[in-house]
Amino acid sequence: MTRLSPQAIALWLLIAGNLTASLSDVMVKLLDGSVSPFQYIFIRQLISVAVIYPLWRKETRVTRQLRSPGLNVFRAHLVLIGSGCMVVAITHMTLASANAVFYAAPLLMLPISVLLMGEKPSRSKVLGTLLGFVGVLIVLRPSQFHWAAFFALGTATTLALFNVSARKLPEQQSMISTLFWTSLLSLPVAGILTVWSWQPINASQLGLIAAGALLILVYNGLAVLAYRKAPAGEIGLAEYSGLVFVTLFGIWWFNEIPDWITAMGIMLIIAPLLPIRRRFRQRIVNS
């Protein structure tokens, strides 16, 4: 009988999460800047709280409790900053180019995981992420650099911090509780920022925001599960799988066909991911 190791399970959870995150990016792209980033974030987080609340209420009193409030507040505002940067980047860049910068997050996760978690990544992990970073540079092509890439880098940084900090969450705080508190604690600041930029929205825009909220909620949940099962340095490269998804979605939905240079950069970004499945799979034979 074949059984996946905890690292392999975490890897697949993260790949599935990146599929949902990629679809969430498509929802933002379809909005095409018609809704301000602050308004988008506030409505998305409000919907997230409404969806999670019934599930949170079913949790036991122990798992519902807010633990490590400072850490949860920190993570909630990472979501705000990263989401705002993401909306700007996706609106002004192609899906593939914006996400190529987003997926610099695993490169940032290596030093962060070393500093915050005391993890010791292998030489192959370091070389793999450096190879991925070379791919990012090829996709961006400094001669054609877009100012929105700075916002994409902001998203990558907050994503790296968000994922690594999940390892410090108390075990007594369930995934549902973590998602609930992260969404709820982000609302006050998001609401204040939204007041300055509020404008009427139609049903179509609200539907896209709601879909994006649900999809990113699934990603956050899967990411929490994944990074609790394995060290960030061991599975962070799986974040690159989302770049494959957004490239395909960009071609399908928006006719954003990458040229050969961009395609080469994307291949360099995802190449380090290819051997992970084989390396982390365990075969256990039960008599």
Tell me the role of every PLM-derived stretch.
Residues 26-29, 37-38, 52, 144-201, ...:
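Transmembrane alpha-helical segments that form core, pore/gating elements
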Residues 16-23, 27, 73-91, 154-165, ...:
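Hydrophobic alpha-helical transmembrane segments of multi-pass membrane transport proteins
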Residues 99-104, 169-182, 220-251:
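Helix-helix packing/entry segments at the starts of transmembrane helices
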Residues 36-48, 88-105, 145-158, 202-216, ...:
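Structural signature of hydrophobic alpha-helical transmembrane segments
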Residues 142, 244-287:
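C-terminal-most transmembrane helix of multi-pass membrane proteins
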Residues 11-14, 66-77, 121-133, 149-154, ...:
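Cytoplasmic-side transmembrane-helix entry/capping segments in multi-pass membrane proteins
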Residues 1-19, 49-74, 123, 184-211, ...:
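Membrane-interface interhelical linkers
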Residues 88, 105-127, 244-263:
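C-terminal transmembrane-helix exit sites in multi-pass transporters
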